Regions:
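Solvent-exposed soluble domains appended to multi-pass membrane proteins
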Residues: 1-254
Length: 254
């Protein structure tokens, strides 16, 4: 299903025992960027009075002099995402309305992944700003109704994931040819797990088992990390590697 990711996992730091903290994008996004636990019956992203008090990766990086950007091909106001992103340090947001009408309607959720990956590649290749930068990108095509412009697998669910994998593989291979690659760190992490194949209970560990991969010229050598970890641990781990303060992330472990 994911030959490109499988190939790339041998080129970077691959965390094999990472688990998602929730079952929805709004929860998983807060878990990832703020290291804050997902709640079963409430979305912190929808509660600005709470979310604006949380630490965040973008906030920490911006204080260290990084330019911060966020790209999503869908409605960035959905589940109050825009408010959360702006309050946690993202300086520039790009969403569906920044694309043509045809591109905005290429998927039920917005702009298909091949279009946004192409946009991101051009943005990174042509970036002129001095100093460090951080760009986050949320894909959307590997989501129900799983209708994508790609037909390698008969079952539409794994086919949608295979499509995003194809987009990722081509993107990384092209990025390797740019001057930015030698200093670049690319982190691949799902927002949540997915119940497929639909066998057994959605409370089973495999429902929450997700991959985490660090790639790029900034990675000294490939390695596999089998230590069990949670999605919330990304914040402290990343900031710790950068030598930045991360004690505010109470639930995140380096």
């Amino acid at each position: 299903m994911t030959p490109h990711f499988n190939r790339l996992s041998k080129e970077g730091v691959f965390f094999t025992n990472c688990y998602a903290n929730s079952f929805r994008t709004d929860r998983g996004t807060v878990c990832t960027f703020s290291g804050y636990l997902g709640l079963p019956t409430a979305s912190v992203m929808k509660i600005p009075a709470k979310s604006r008090t949380l630490p965040a990766i973008a906030e920490g990086l911006s204080k260290a002099g990084y330019k911060t950007d966020f790209l999503y091909g869908g409605d960035i106001n959905f589940t109050n995402m825009k408010s959360y992103l702006l309050s946690t340090g993202y300086q520039r947001l790009t969403a569906n309305t920044d694309f043509s009408l045809a591109e905005q309607t290429s998927n039920a959720w917005g702009v298909n992944d091949d279009i946004t990956f192409e946009y991101l590649y051009n943005q990174l290749r042509n970036r002129k700003e001095e100093g460090p930068w951080h760009t986050a990108f949320l894909t959307l095509s590997s989501h129900e109704p799983f209708e994508v412009p790609y037909h390698r697998l008969e079952d539409k669910i794994p086919n949608a994931f295979a499509y995003t994998d194809e987009c990722l593989g081509k993107f990384v291979d092209r990025l390797k040819q740019t001057p930015a690659w030698k200093d670049l760190l690319v982190i691949c992490l799902p927002d949540h797990g997915f119940y497929y194949p639909r066998e057994g209970s959605n409370a089973m560990p495999r429902f929450y088992h997700i991959p985490l991969l660090w790639l790029g010229g900034a990675v000294k050598q490939p390695m596999q990390v089998d230590k069990i970890m949670n999605q919330t641990d990304l914040a402290a781990t990343l900031l710790g590697q950068l030598g930045l303060e991360h004690t505010a992330f109470t639930f995140s472990r380096n």
